[in-house]
Amino acid sequence: MTQKKVAILGAGSWGTGLALVLADNNHKPVIWGNLDKIVNEINESHTNSHYLPDIILPTEVKATLSLDEAIDGAEIVVIAIPTNAMRVVCKQLNEALKEPTILVHVSKGIEPETNLRMSEVIEEEIDAKKRNALVVLSGPSHAEEVALRHPTTLCASCKDLKAAEVVQDRFINNNLRIYTNDDVIGAEIGGALKNIIALGAGISDGLGYGDNAKAALMTRGMAEITRLGVAVGSNPQTFYGLTGIGDLIVTCTSVHSRNWRAGNMLGKGENLDEVLEKMGMVVEGVRTAKAVHGWANKLDIDMPITESIYAILFENKDAREAVDLLMGRKKKIEKESF
């Protein structure tokens, strides 16, 4: 395989994990970070102890504080940053890009102020002439397990399947299997909204409820995700795949999940401010719950689990009371029609 340079914007766990994969595949990953300490640690010690403790990075993984240096000559630019920084970083990237490039994003969330998916934010901020294609790389994955080279599957979603195949070729190896898909909307809706349901799964576990409750929450949560997704143009079949039910399962059932951990603390009685301070990392489901609350109301989409989680987060709703209200809702048939 011909060696390619790939820029990765973001020196967090996911950006660093993907850089490791690219180095394993004999490519040249360059991580752009904004903290001297982390950039220096990656370059000098070949570790990123804050985000991926105990992982030794290949020496081919490089990091820089210079955006221009990171993207110079890169075939692909991977955007691996929290959703609340997406616009700011994309404005910088738009200024820095000198030629059309394949853009990949791995950020899972909805912008609360606009209800825009991350690909829509990127398209607003980066000139079309500077984008060869925009690919969403998503699926059931924890960066920690990718960095440990445990078997993982992802999906590269793009309207241009040839561009998705380029991304597939750069990342696929014996540890990371990549599929392709043309449903960008579905991939982004599934990836963003599962974080809300994962908060709920953590709350359920924190309250001491068992597997029955969590299975019901996940199943009915996926019905809500699909309902909204189809309303905004997704293929319902996408939600049965890696970026839908796959991502939901891994995020709702693992202690690696920031959203599950945050929900678990909420279920045990801590308030949101305390939880976010203890986490010390972005919990995307909190921001997404705020966005989807208004979005679902605007579209008149029935999302009772999502609304209950919003109430716990932002209206000081008692978690047990929220569960009681969900269980006491008017009886209905399970069958969904889209």
Curated annotation (Swiss-Prot):
Disulfide bonds: none annotated. One of its GO terms (molecular function) is glycerol-3-phosphate dehydrogenase [NAD(P)+] activity. The keyword Heme does not apply. Pathway: Membrane lipid metabolism; glycerophospholipid metabolism. The active site is at K194. GO terms for biological process: carbohydrate metabolic process; glycerol-3-phosphate biosynthetic process; glycerol-3-phosphate catabolic process; glycerophospholipid metabolic process; phospholipid biosynthetic process. This is Glycerol-3-phosphate dehydrogenase [NAD(P)+]. The keyword Lipid biosynthesis applies.
